[in-house]
From Swiss-Prot:
NCBIfam families: hrcA
GO molecular function: DNA binding
Name this protein carries in UniProt: Heat-inducible transcription repressor HrcA
Keyword Transcription regulation in annotation: yes
Family: Belongs to the HrcA family.
UniProt xrefs under InterPro entries: GAF-like_dom_sf, HrcA, HrcA_C, WH-like_DNA-bd_sf, WH_DNA-bd_sf, WHTH_transcript_rep_HrcA_IDD
Any Pfam family: HrcA
Key words, A-Z: Repressor, Stress response, Transcription, Transcription regulation
PANTHER family: HEAT-INDUCIBLE TRANSCRIPTION REPRESSOR HRCA
Record-level GO BP terms: negative regulation of DNA-templated transcription
Cited function: Negative regulator of class I heat shock genes (grpE-dnaK-dnaJ and groELS operons). Prevents heat-shock induction of these operons.
Source species of the chain: Mycolicibacterium paratuberculosis (strain ATCC BAA-968 / K-10)
């Protein structure tokens, strides 16, 4: 790329930075005063004219300054040399805050609150998708000789407790056998495979004796736990930040809030995140949702090196601090994965 093109990109980068910081359209004189561009105001004016002709910036109807377009933001994001790093103190604070979560729900609630505070946008975290989770542990506890508590723990930290009414009593030996059979069928398997295994076990042990009936009743309850669609659950925080930036949405705030409430668009965008550590930025119309015009979403997946638990990210106006937001989303996602993977 020629030096003139590089210089124009520096002008575009300066316009984006100033507009994000001030919300005010930017003129050539202001750019020369604030940034060390190394050229005259006349040259900057010419560069801005080229950027406008190519669709990277535009002139608001009442201003002599210019603001970035969606195309301009996309060029800026695509050519980010590096993401604004979080300080060691910030990273340590994030890690300590998330590690203090007592269980999966608490960790995710903390993550949403933290991400909304860091970015001053709407933070969204998807509960771990069951299809990618593995059964890490199964506990079978006798509450009474005819009533059991089943506790299923997945590798993503989800704990599900279910009561099984046996209809008949079983002794300690039968309870031990039941625990062993169910554990062998479930532990270490993906939830989709575990549901098949427990159904097969119930089919194989269809017999009139007490244990066969106990396996059947336990399998019925466990299947309810294993096939429940928790991937449709979202946690959101910081929606008040949308109203703080209401002027950025040009009258479309209500439709954006409705889209968030319906969750369909957000779930679709989060479901597209299949690789932990990879951050995706969708700007304006790139969300492919008419009701989300004027917004950008910065999303990623969280999980371990070999397992994606779910998607997460932030939503805000296209006038967004992209370097800072990308860094915050990536850092929080990394620490969620570490915290949940260690449990």
């Amino acid at each position: 790329m020629g030096s003139a093109d590089e210089r124009r990109f520096e002008v575009l980068r300066a316009i984006v930075a100033d507009f994000v910081a001030t919300k005010e359209p930017i003129g050539s004189k202001t750019l020369v005063e604030r940034h060390n561009l190394g050229v005259s105001s006349a040259t900057v004016r010419n560069d801005m004219a080229v950027l406008e002709a190519e669709g990277y910036i535009t002139q608001p109807h009442t201003s002599s300054g210019r603001v970035p377009t969606e195309k301009g933001y996309r060029e800026f994001v695509d050519r980010l040399d590096d993401v604004k790093p979080l300080s060691a103190a910030e990273r340590r604070a994030i890690q300590n805050f998330l590690e203090s979560g007592v269980d999966l729900d608490d960790v995710l609630r903390r993550a949403v609150r933290l991400l909304a505070q860091l970015t001053r946008q709407v933070a969204i975290v998807q509960y771990p998708t069951l299809s990618s989770s593995t059964v890490r542990h199964l506990e079978v506890i006798a509450l009474t000789p005819a009533r059991l508590l089943m506790v299923v723990i997945t590798d993503s930290g989800r704990v599900d407790q279910r009561i099984v009414e046996l209809g008949d009593v079983i002794d300690d030996h039968e309870l031990s056998r039941l625990r062993e059979m169910l554990g062998q069928a479930l532990v270490g398997k993906k939830l989709s495979a575990a549901s098949v295994a427990v159904a097969d076990l119930a089919e194989q042990l269809r017999s009139p004796d007490g244990l066969g009936d106990a396996v059947g009743r336990s399998a019925t309850v466990l299947l309810e736990s294993l096939v429940e669609h928790s991937e449709e659950r979202l946690l959101m925080g910081g929606t008040a930040n949308l109203t703080r930036n209401a002027a950025d949405f040009g009258g479309s705030l209500r439709s954006i809030l409705e889209a968030l409430e319906e969750q369909v668009v957000v779930l679709r965008l989060l479901a597209a995140q299949q690789e932990a550590g990879k951050v995706t930025v969708r700007i304006g119309h790139e969300t492919a949702a008419e009701q989300m015009v004027g917004t950008s979403m910065v999303t990623t997946a969280y999980g371990t090196s070999d397992t994606v638990y779910g998607g997460m990210g932030v939503l805000g106006p296209t006038r967004m601090d992209y370097p800072g937001t990308i860094a915050s989303v990536a850092a929080v996602a990394m620490y969620i994965g570490e915290v949940l993977g260690a449990r």
